[in-house]
Amino acid sequence: MAQDQGEKENPMRELRIRKLCLNICVGESGDRLTRAAKVLEQLTGQTPVFSKARYTVRSFGIRRNEKIAVHCTVRGAKAEEILEKGLKVREYELRKNNFSDTGNFGFGIQEHIDLGIKYDPSIGIYGLDFYVVLGRPGFSIADKKRRTGCIGAKHRISKEEAMRWFQQKHDGIILPGN
């Protein structure tokens, strides 16, 4: 009887943003990297973390363990707010290739000033990468240290589900691949 009056969605199957990872890779340590860190701090209000190079690449002038990038992880309402700004820059258009098989997606923007940050000549202009990790209630059992659980096959997020969520939640447009 209850199903005839309007099928209710299972609240445990609802997709939501687990985290938003923002990354600026400068490719060198020094002043440009610290200015990129200031950009991320202005955007998120959090202290960003520096990433080191894994290998020495002589052609790029990068040494192993040299700080070359800066990233920040944002969760909750702040993540949704920043994602909305980033999608507005991209005009809510993503390619099919932007979505991974595990239901996550990422994209990049050319200039951080498009997000509403005031241009500062002493900092310059940086591009940044957005990476969104989607999840459902119950996904945290896979992250526990003690008595780690597995996420069942039916509860995992597919590429198609992530694309459908993007289209419904953000009225997004998905363009064909390459």
Swiss-Prot record:
UniProt xrefs under InterPro entries: Ribosomal_uL5 (IPR002132), Ribosomal_uL5_C (IPR031309), Ribosomal_uL5_CS (IPR020929), Ribosomal_uL5_dom_sf (IPR022803), Ribosomal_uL5_N (IPR031310)
Claim: Acetylation is one of the keywords in the record: yes
Subcellular location: Nucleus, Nucleolus; Cytoplasm
Site of covalent link Glycyl lysine isopeptide (Lys-Gly) (interchain with G-Cter in SUMO2): 38, 52, 154
Job of this protein: Component of the ribosome, a large ribonucleoprotein complex responsible for the synthesis of proteins in the cell. The small ribosomal subunit (SSU) binds messenger RNAs (mRNAs) and translates the encoded message by selecting cognate aminoacyl-transfer RNA (tRNA) molecules. The large subunit (LSU) contains the ribosomal catalytic site termed the peptidyl transferase center (PTC), which catalyzes the formation of peptide bonds, thereby polymerizing the amino acids delivered by tRNAs into a polypeptide chain.
Assembly, per entry: Component of the large ribosomal subunit (LSU). Part of the 5S RNP complex, which is a LSU subcomplex composed of the 5S RNA, RPL5 and RPL11. Component of a hexameric 5S RNP precursor complex, composed of 5S RNA, RRS1, RPF2/BXDC1, RPL5, RPL11 and HEATR3; this complex acts as a precursor for ribosome assembly. Interacts with PML. Interacts with MDM2 (via its RanBP2-type zinc finger domain); negatively regulates MDM2-mediated TP53 ubiquitination and degradation. Interacts with NOP53; retains RPL11 into the nucleolus.
Record's protein name: Large ribosomal subunit protein uL5
Gene name of this polypeptide: RPL11
